[in-house]
């Protein structure tokens, strides 16, 4: 049977949504693991990751049920939501890949000033204090404060990894963006195909 057939379209759509389900569970698991082992203390960051995971899980569930049952309404809404997610994710991925070092520094500084718990995590894990300079009046949880060694600012250390992280996130985002547009195309084809097991006189 050619891959344009009903069964092949159904199987491909089910496999794609199973992939999204695994990714969503992985996101939720990583967030829970990070806060469980004390690597992340920011409830805002964990909440965002878990919310994205749950949202992706619900989308995958709608797509999976729609594909198995060949449900026209579910497939329609799944296709629309997936298209909107593709537009947002593709835009964010391109922005991640297009940021230069100066823009990365400005973005990191904004995040540094607005998230106290994440700032404390960075200072503790990277053993640094302050963003661009060390202020002795600020609270710092880095171990270098208790030792005789002087603490370094965090901006140069974060800057070493920021570009690589943004390229990695942008690349992964682009990959999943193309899987989403593939999902939209598969859903459109599958939705307009007739189930060979259905009653030939039934209305699609």
UniProtKB/Swiss-Prot annotation:
* Positions in the Extracellular compartment: 41-44, 94-167
- Which Pfam families is this protein grouped with? Tetraspanin
Q: Which GO terms describe its cellular component?
A: membrane; plasma membrane
- What are the transmembrane regions? 20-40, 45-65, 73-93, 168-188
An example of a GO molecular function for this protein is:
calcium channel regulator activity
- Family per similarity comment: Belongs to the tetraspanin (TM4SF) family.
Full protein name: Tetraspanin-13
Q: Give the species this sequence originates from.
A: Homo sapiens (Human)
Keywords annotated in UniProt = Glycoprotein, Membrane, Phosphoprotein, Transmembrane, Transmembrane helix
Membrane topology of the entry: Multi-pass membrane protein
Glycosylation is annotated at 113, 137
**Modified sites of kind Phosphoserine:** 143
Q: Where in the cell is it found?
A: Membrane
